[in-house]
Structure formats: structure tokens, C-alpha cells
């Protein structure tokens, strides 16, 4: 019985993850412009309405939307982040070349 409950719990959790991922949408400029996101890796990204960008780890620079995602250019880095907005309002960012896989939400 215990084994069935564990299997059922695992299946339910996996289905929620898959449904959440399926409902995620690429981030839009309006989601970021003028906002700051606090990431689970301890960094804070600020996306200025005029395209300015700052991050506590990667420095200051610019951001813009591209077909591939969010282009970030700072004094230290230049990369495109694949950013999704999840149904619960959190964000998920992946930057394979930098080894970044972070979840965040609007800073309060």
C-alpha cells in the first residue's frame, strides 16, 4: 500500500510540473519593463523601461527582446536568456552557455 501511495504521489507531482510547463509562456517586454526580479540564485535583475539593465552578479548594461529571448548585454556578459512566465506569476530563466537555470518573482 505504501508503495502505491508513493507512486501515486510521484505521478501527481510529475503531472503538475508538466501542466505548469505546458502553460508557461515566453516572457513579454511588458512583463519586465520597469520591474525587478529576485532570483532564487540570490541575484536581482532590474529591467529599466528605457532598456537599461542591472544585475547584482552580472553588472550594468542593456536588455532587449529578441526572437530567441531576452538579450542581456553588460560590462561583463553578453547572452540571450530564455525566460518563461509561469501561470503562478513566477519566472523561469535558462542560459545554457552560463549554466544558469533560475526561478524568480517580482521583488517586493
Q: What is the predicted function of each stretch?
A:
Residues 1-5:
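Positively charged n-region of N-terminal signal peptides that target proteins for export
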Residues 9-19:
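Bacterial N-terminal signal peptides
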Residues 6, 20-108:
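Lipid interaction determinants
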Amino acid at each position: 500500500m505504501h508503495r502505491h501511495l508513493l507512486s501515486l504521489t510521484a505521478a501527481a507531482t510529475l503531472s503538475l510540473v508538466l501542466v505548469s510547463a505546458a502553460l508557461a509562456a515566453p516572457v513579454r517586454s511588458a512583463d519586465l519593463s520597469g520591474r525587478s526580479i529576485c532570483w532564487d540564485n540570490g541575484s536581482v535583475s532590474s529591467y529599466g523601461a528605457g532598456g537599461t539593465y542591472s544585475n547584482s552578479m552580472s553588472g550594468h548594461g542593456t536588455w532587449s527582446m529578441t526572437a530567441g529571448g531576452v538579450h542581456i548585454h553588460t560590462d561583463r556578459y553578453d547572452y540571450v536568456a530564455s525566460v518563461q512566465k509561469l501561470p503562478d506569476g513566477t519566472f523561469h530563466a535558462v542560459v545554457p552557455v552560463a549554466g544558469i537555470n533560475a526561478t524568480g518573482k517580482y521583488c517586493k
